[in-house]
Amino acid sequence: MSDVRVGVIGIGYWGPNVLRNFAALPGVEVVAVADRDDRRLREVRDAYPHIAVTKDYADFVRLGVDAVAIATPPATHFPIARDCLEYGLHVLVEKPLALNVRDAELLVDLAERRGLTLMVGHTFEYNPAVRRVKQIIESGTLGKIHYIDSSRVNLGIFQSSVNVIWDLAPHDISILLYLLGMEPLTVSAEGNASIFEDVHDIAHIHMKFPGNTLAHVHVSWLSPTKTRRMVIVGSEKMLVYDDIADEKVRLYDRQAIPLASAAPGDTRCHYRYGDSVALPVDWVE
C-alpha cells in the first residue's frame, strides 16, 4: 500500500507539532504545507526541504495531496474544512470542529455525501491513561457510574478568537463521551467574562446521561494553578485520572454504604475507606 500523502494547513502555535508528528509517522508522506506567513514557510522549507510550501491550500489538489490536517485558528476551521472536503480530500481538523452546531453538521453531511473521512483531533481518546480508565469502567470494577467531575484550569492563555469553552472543554467532553459510550440527555452551561468583555474565561458545564449519570466540567483561564483532573465515582469504587501527576490513574476502594438496618429516611451509612492503588498504564501508543 502506498503512503498517504498529507498536507498541513497552518504552522502557527500548534501546526509545527502536527507537522513533526506526521513527518515521523510510517506510512505517511507530508508533501505540502500551507500558511499565510512567509517567515513560517521559510522555516518549514529550511527544516523540510522536500516539502512544498504555499500560501494557498487550493494548491494541494495539484500537488496530489490525499488528506489534510488543519491547525489554524478555530474561526477558520469550518471554511477551510469545507473547501478541502469539496476538493475531495480527507480532513483531520484540530478541535473545535466548528464554532456552532449548524456548521459542524454541514461538515459531517458533506463528508458523508462525498465518502470522505472527517476527523477531529480529540487526542485524549488515544491517550494510554484514558484508555486504561475506559478499561476499568467497562470491566465493571467501579460499578454503576454515579457521576464524573472534571477540571481543566490554568492561568491563561487568553485568546480573542475563542472563549475558554472552545479552548479547553472539547478535551473533557470528548473524554466523557469516550468513557461513557453514550451522549447526554441534557446539557447546560454557565460562565463569566471576568477580564475581557464578551470573552468568557470561566465556565461550568453540566450534563445528564442515561441511567441518571451526571457529569460536570469546570474550565478556566483564571486559576492560580494548573489542573487536569477527572474524578469518577461508581457504586462500587472510585477512580481519579490526573493528567499532570506521575501516577495518572488511581483506584480507590471507598464507598458510602447505607446501614442494612436503616429505616426509611435514615441516612446513616457505613463508610468504607479501603486501599488506593496506582494502576499501571501501558504507554505504547
Question: Which role fits each region the language model picked out?
Answer:
Residues 1-48:
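N-terminal Rossmann-like dinucleotide-binding module
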Residues 75, 98-160:
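A contiguous active-site-proximal alpha/beta segment in oxidoreductase catalytic domains
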Residues 32, 67, 147:
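Short, Asp-centered acidic motifs that coordinate Mg2+ and/or phosphate
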Residues 173-254, 284:
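Contiguous beta-strand/loop segments that form the cofactor/metal-binding neighborhood of enzyme cores
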Residues 18, 48-109:
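Beta-loop-alpha module in the N-terminal Rossmann-like domain of NAD(P)-dependent dehydrogenases
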Residues 123, 236-285:
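C-terminal glycine/acidic-rich active-site capping loop/insertion
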Residues 55, 93, 118-120, 149, ...:
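Hydrophobic residues in well-ordered beta-strands that form the structural core
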Residues 121-128, 153-186, 199-201:
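Mid-domain beta-loop-alpha active-site segment that forms a flexible
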